[in-house]
Amino acid sequence: MYLLLLLIMLNMLMMSMIYLFMLFMNKMKNNLNLIIGNLIIINLLLNLFNLNWIDWIYIFCNLSFNMYSYGLIMLTLWIFGLIFISLNNNSLNCLFMNLLLMISLLLVFLSMNLLLFYLFYEFGLLLIFYLVVKWGYSENRWLSGFYLMFYTMIFSLPMLYIIYYIYLIDYSLNFMLMEMLNLNLNMMLFIYLLMSFLVKIPIYLFHGWLLKAHVEAPYYGSMILASIMLKLGGYGMLRLMIIYKNEFILIQKILVMINSFGVLILSLMCLSQFDMKSIIAISSIVHMGLMIMSMMTFLKISLIGGYLMMISHGLSSSGLFFLVNVIYSQTNSRLMFINKGMINFMPSMSLLWFMLCSSNMGSPVSLNLISEVMLLIGMISWLKFMMLILMMYCLFSFIYSIYLFMFINHGKIFIMFKIKNGILVEYFVLLLHWIPLNLMFLKLYFI
C-alpha cells in the first residue's frame, strides 16, 4: 500500500516538473502549438495508470475502443503532442490540418463500423496527401503525392464495393457482430480487401509510394506516416484476422514467403542508400514485413508481438525522422556524404542518435526488443526453417542501424560552416520519444 502511494506521489512529482518545464518553454516561445502540445501530453500522462483497465468495451454511436485500439490511440495522441510542441511553422493552416488529421486518425481507431472505418481511413490519406504537396521540400512533391494517391486509391476505391457486398450478405458492418457470426467471403473479394490494407502497411512489392512520400514530406509528415499511418494497415489486418480467419489460413504461406524475401532484400537495400530518410523509411517497411510475417501464424504471442511492434516502431521511427530534420534544418541536406562527423558539432545530439538507433535495432531494454522476441518465437514455433531467415534479419537490422549512426556521426568533416548543438525543445521532444520506448517494458501486463 505504501509502495503504491509512493509511486503515485513520484508520478505526480514527475508530471508537475514536466508541466513547469512546458510552462517555461511557453514563456520562451509563446505560440499556440506549444499550448496544444502541452495539453495533449499532460492529459496522456494522467491516463498512464489506466493501461490495465482496457478489458471492457465502451460503445457510443459506433465508436468504441478495446485492447487493439487503446495503445494506438495513446500513440497517436503522444506523437501529435510532440509534433505540436516542435512545430516551427506558425501558419494556422498547418496547425489546423494537423489537428484535423489527428482527429481523423483517432476516429479510425475508435470506429466499430466497417464503413466508418473506411471513410475516416481515406479522409486521413487525403489530409496526408495535402501535407506532402503543400509543405513538401521540392517540386518532386507533386510526383510523390501522385504515387501516394495512385497506390492507395487503386485498391481503396473497390473496397467501397466490397463493403457494400458484405452488407448485402450479412446485414451488418459492425465489427463485434461480424466477429460473432464467423463469416465467409469470396476469395477474390477477400484478397482485394486485404490488399487495400497491405498496400498501406506497405508490403514488399507495393512499397514504392512510401519511399517517395517520405523523401518529399515535411518532417512532421514523415513522423505521422511512419508512426501512425503505416499502423492503420496493421490495425485493419488485426480486425480482419478475427473476422475472416479461414480465408487468412488459405493464403498465410504466400504472405509469409513474400515477406520473408522482402525483409532480407529491403535490409540489403538499406546498406546501399545515401539519403538518411530513405534508410529510415526502408527500415520501417522491414519492421512491418516482420510483423505481417509473424502475425500470419495466428499464435497469441505473435499477435501480441505484432501489436507491440506497431507501438514501439512508431516511437523509434518518429524520433529518427525528427533527428534527420534537426540536421537538415542546419545543413539543408539529407545526404550522409555531406553530413559526416556530426559528433564534433553536436555531441549531445549524437548520443540521442545512438540511443534511438540502438532502440530501432532492438537493443535492451527497449520495447522493440520485447516485440521482436515475441515475433521471432512465434515464427520459429510455426516453422523451424524460418530460424535461418530470422537470424539473417537480426544481423542485417544490426548492420544498417549501426551504418546509419556511424556514417553520420563519425568520419571526415565536409561541412565548413558552423552548426549549433540543438535547442532545448529538440532535446525535449527526442527524450519524449526515447523514454516511453524504453520504460514501457515495466508495464506490459496491460496486454
Curated annotation (Swiss-Prot):
E.C. designation(s): 7.1.1.2
Secretion signal span: none
Transmembrane segments: 4-24, 34-54, 67-87, 100-120, 149-169, 189-209, 223-243, 248-268, 279-299, 304-324, 349-371, 388-408, 422-442
Protein keywords: Electron transport, Membrane, Mitochondrion, NAD, Respiratory chain, Translocase, Transmembrane, Transmembrane helix, Transport, Ubiquinone
UniProt-recorded name of the protein: NADH-ubiquinone oxidoreductase chain 4
Protein's cellular compartments: Mitochondrion membrane
Record's bilayer topology term: Multi-pass membrane protein
The keyword Transmembrane helix appears for this protein: yes
The family this protein is said to belong to: Belongs to the complex I subunit 4 family.
Membrane found in the keyword field: yes
Function: Core subunit of the mitochondrial membrane respiratory chain NADH dehydrogenase (Complex I) that is believed to belong to the minimal assembly required for catalysis. Complex I functions in the transfer of electrons from NADH to the respiratory chain. The immediate electron acceptor for the enzyme is believed to be ubiquinone.
Gene Ontology CC terms, in alphabetical order: mitochondrial membrane
Catalytic activity field: a ubiquinone + NADH + 5 H(+)(in) = a ubiquinol + NAD(+) + 4 H(+)(out)
Originating species: Apis mellifera ligustica (Common honeybee)
Name of encoding gene: ND4
